[in-house]
């Protein structure tokens, strides 16, 4: 299960940033008591969009216990990989620590962008984590419009999701006016999914939200992802991208092309 919240931050030097908080529930079923889980992970969709790289910065990882207790994980100084790391006498790298593997993506070298949680040998149990990370270049600016593009979940593990709940919060000062924006969702076997809007769910923000259950979370091989796009134009073309990075199409009028691609999808 995933509970996702993204907050748009359009401030100097922030490069189209959103701050993301996720609560992840893992239902662990190890093959045997002699073959336990020693690490869990959350893939971070890794890609270049219009010439700029979607970057991540991990701020914190916490384990949430059923009684409400919170255990704050420390950052591990290196990738916890060799068999010699997995011994009780050496806790420098884990368990109880996390590591941000930055990639770049290379399956031949077993290299992916993800957050790894080093755990103490799990067999059959349910564990909950809360992670906070920053995603850069989610806000893209063009000559006559802007796009908030959130690649929220993808990869092989998407087929194991039981539920996915999300909120996207845009500060009121950065939210385009009605008639100056549209929203498109992407993914699942239906190709898109419904969402809701609220002006008062989170004070100070305009909120987009959606909830997907096991029935919704069915995918074809060509659309194993969950994505959200907010497109602004007209008088509010740059309402949430004043401080966005310069991309390959920063100075080019792109609204018609984006509309065409949305319609074709």
For every predicted segment, state its role.
Residues 1-265:
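Lumenal/extracellular ectodomains and adaptor appendage modules
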């Amino acid at each position: 299960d995933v509970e996702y919240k993204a907050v748009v931050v359009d401030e100097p030097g922030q490069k189209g940033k959103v701050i993301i908080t996720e609560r992840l529930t893992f239902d662990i079923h190890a093959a045997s008591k002699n073959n336990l889980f020693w690490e869990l992970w959350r893939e971070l969709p890794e890609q270049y969009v219009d010439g700029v790289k979607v970057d991540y910065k991990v701020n914190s990882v916490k384990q949430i216990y059923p009684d409400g207790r919170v255990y704050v994980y420390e950052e591990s100084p290196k990738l916890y990989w060799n068999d010699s790391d997995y011994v009780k006498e050496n806790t420098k790298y884990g368990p109880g620590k996390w590591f941000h593997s930055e990639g770049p993506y290379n399956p031949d070298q077993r290299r992916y962008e993800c957050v790894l949680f080093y755990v103490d040998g799990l067999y059959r149990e349910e564990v909950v984590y809360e992670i906070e990370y920053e995603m850069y270049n989610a806000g893209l600016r063009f000559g006559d419009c802007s796009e908030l593009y959130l690649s929220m979940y993808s990869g092989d593990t998407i087929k194991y999701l039981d539920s996915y709940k999300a909120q996207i919060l845009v500060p009121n000062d950065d939210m385009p006016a009605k008639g100056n924006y549209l929203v498109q969702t992407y993914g699942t076997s239906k190709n898109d999914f419904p969402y809701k809007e609220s002006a008062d769910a989170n004070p100070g923000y305009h909120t987009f939200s959606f909830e997907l259950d096991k029935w919704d979370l069915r995918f074809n091989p060509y659309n194993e992802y969950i994505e959200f796009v907010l497109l602004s134009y007209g008088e509010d073309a740059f309402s949430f991208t004043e401080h966005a990075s310069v991309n390959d199409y920063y100075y080019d009028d792109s609204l018609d092309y984006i509309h065409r691609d949305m319609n074709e999808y």
